[in-house]
Amino acid sequence: WCDGSYLEDQDKFRMSGIFRDVYILKRPKQAISDYHIKTRIEDMLAKVEIEMKFYFPLNVKISIEDRNGAVVALGSIAEEGTAVLEIASPELWNTENPYLYKLILETENEVIVDHIALRKIEIKDQVIYLNGQKIKFRGVNRHDSDPVTGFTISLEQLTTDLTLMKQHNFNAIRSSHYPNAPFFYEMCDKYGFMVIDEADIEAHGPFMIYRKEDTDYNRFKRWNEKIADDPVWEEAIVDRVKLMVERDKNRFCIVMWSMGNESAYGCNFEKALEWTKNFDPDRITQYESARYRNYDETYDYSNLDVYSRMYPALSEIQEYLDKDGSKPLLLVEYCHSMGNGPGDFEDYFQMIQDNDKMCGGFVWEWCDHAIAHGTAENGKTIYAYGGDHGEEIHDGNFCMDGLVYPDRTVH
């Protein structure tokens, strides 16, 4: 436990250890320290802007190849700044045709190979467009979870997940509720998924403890006081958002930045959103928990692009649409149930399809969370979950709520 534990109260198993690869990379002193790729689509021309930072001055040769290996753009840069390359008649990336170009950055001492997707995400008249086409997020929330390896996820398991999602017509994933391993985004670029990248911030537990004697109304009204609206937490909250955005800025599957989950709203999230929009104005921002704040105070929502909700009734959705709200409406979570699925699926789907300002939703959630505990007499795997390890405090079967079993067998 540490002070960071207050910001990591996601609904999942609690496990200890190092879950992802850790490595040391030795590089020459004369090297690229960072690069930031931005793209501009103008009719039949794409401009690729690559902002570079160096440890020491050096010459960089830049080339872009199409998927057949043909060079479509060349450039160079000899000092920190931005190189601009142009691609004529570009192939645009989308979820049905996730076309990727190869980027090669060559210096005297090393070669860096990355990929680029050409796509444009924007909001016009409360409707979200990808490459000028109205889109619907047919999304799902995905946790890192394996019945044998826990939070450690292999490329093979992720490939299984993404393949199953494609087979069942999902086109979007929310990284609930923390940034995933870097290869997750590379695979989403390749497979064609739009991603909501979410910061590792969730703090609904502390407010339940500090306000446990309050009425539900007062708890939600003052939820934000301890963390979201206390400047003591500004550095921690903004830092987590910055680390996510800085690390993942060159992954084009990411169309939306999420400030976190279920942590209420206040001055610290205002700062995080302000930094994010200044750094990356081309992507959309969302934060469902922005609606939980001190009702006696006024807050800045100008850097939030989407009005997002969890589990609203159909009547609430219709009320927002009738009032002609100023932002697109997104269901970041819906259709949550343990055991058999909940009803009203068709009604929600129909409402999403019938209203351009309702840009889609993300089903909660992808997989059941459980730990493999050997084999039963009938040959089936025994899966243990809340309470099966003798713990006094647990959530029962609350995390057995996925569309697939822990081993990814479809329900």
Q: What does each model-identified segment do?
A:
Residues 1-195, 240, 255-256, 272-282, ...:
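Secreted/periplasmic carbohydrate-active enzymes, especially glycoside hydrolases
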Residues 10-18, 24, 29, 238-239, ...:
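Substrate-binding clefts and catalytic carboxylate motifs of secreted carbohydrate-active enzymes
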Residues 138-143, 151, 198-235, 241-245, ...:
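Aromatic- and acidic-residue-enriched carbohydrate-binding clefts of CAZyme catalytic domains
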Residues 138-140, 173-175, 195-197, 255, ...:
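Hydrophobic faces of well-ordered beta-strands that scaffold small-molecule active sites
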Residues 142, 178, 200-202, 260-262, ...:
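Active-site beta-loop-alpha junctions enriched in small/polar residues
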Residues 173-182, 262-267, 293-295, 315, ...:
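Acidic-and-aromatic substrate-binding clefts and catalytic sites of carbohydrate-active enzymes
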Residues 187-191, 210-214, 300-303, 376-378:
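Short low-complexity, flexible loop/linker segments enriched in glycine and/or proline
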Residues 190, 225-326:
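Active-site neighborhood of glycoside hydrolase catalytic domains
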